[in-house]
C-alpha cells in the first residue's frame, strides 16, 4: 500500500536538501551556475574562468549527488516498507514522484517566484544587472519540461536499481 505521509516526508526532505545545496552555490557565486542561466545573459557576461569551472564542479558535487542518489534511496525505503512487494510500476512512480517534486518546486518557486519575479541581487551576475532575460518565464518552463523527462528517467533508473538490488 502507498504510504502518502512517507512520500511527503521523502519529497520534502529531497526538496529541502537540493534547494539548500543549490542556493549555497548561487549565493556563494552566481557565476558557478552560469550554465543554467538564460542564453541572453550568458552572451553578455564573460565565460567561466578555469577557477570558476573547478569550483562549479567541486562545490556543485553535493547538489548533483543529492539530485541523483536521494530518489533511489527513498525508493529503497519505499520497497522495504512494502516488504519487497512493490512492483516495478509502483517503484517507478515513487522514484519519479520524488524527483518530480523537486522539479516542480524548482520551476514554480525557485525559478518563477525567486529568480524571475523577485530576482534577488545575489542571483544577478555582475554585468547583467537589469537584463530582461531575468524575467524569461518561458526559459524556465522549458527547463521544467526537460526536468520532467529527467524525473521520468530517474524514476526508471531508481526503479530498476531497487527492483534488482532491493
Question: What are these regions, as identified by a protein language model?
Answer:
Residues 1-97, 101-166:
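Juxtamembrane/disordered regions of integral membrane proteins
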